[in-house]
Amino acid sequence: MKAGIHPEYREVLFHDVSNDFKFITRSTINTREKIEFEGTEYPLVKIEVSSESHPFYTGKHKIVDTAGRVDKFRKKFGTVGSKTQMAE
């Protein structure tokens, strides 16, 4: 393998913010946040859904706020690239 071109493969702590579940796995993901967990400092990645909170794995129905996301997207980007705008 060529030296210096591969991403760093290290232990990372993933935090499921929907149910406060944390797990450590190895990853090459880049993150700016760090957290101390069980006496060791790890890079931190916050996620909204994991196997501990996903309805498929838990068997519980959960309402996901997709409407809020769509509204936020429309506010941010408006009608850029819409069909009516392209026809003009």
From Swiss-Prot:
Keywords: Ribonucleoprotein, Ribosomal protein. InterPro entries: Ribosomal_bL28/bL31-like_sf, Ribosomal_bL31, Ribosomal_bL31_B, Ribosomal_bL31_sf. Pfam families: Ribosomal_L31. One of its GO terms (molecular function) is structural constituent of ribosome. GO terms for biological process: translation. It comes from the Bacteria. Gene3D superfamilies: Ribosomal protein L31. One of its GO terms (cellular component) is ribonucleoprotein complex. Part of the 50S ribosomal subunit. PANTHER family: 50S RIBOSOMAL PROTEIN L31, CHLOROPLASTIC, LARGE RIBOSOMAL SUBUNIT PROTEIN BL31C. HAMAP family: Ribosomal_bL31_2 (MF_00502). Belongs to the bacterial ribosomal protein bL31 family. Type B subfamily. This is Large ribosomal subunit protein bL31B. The gene is rpmE2.
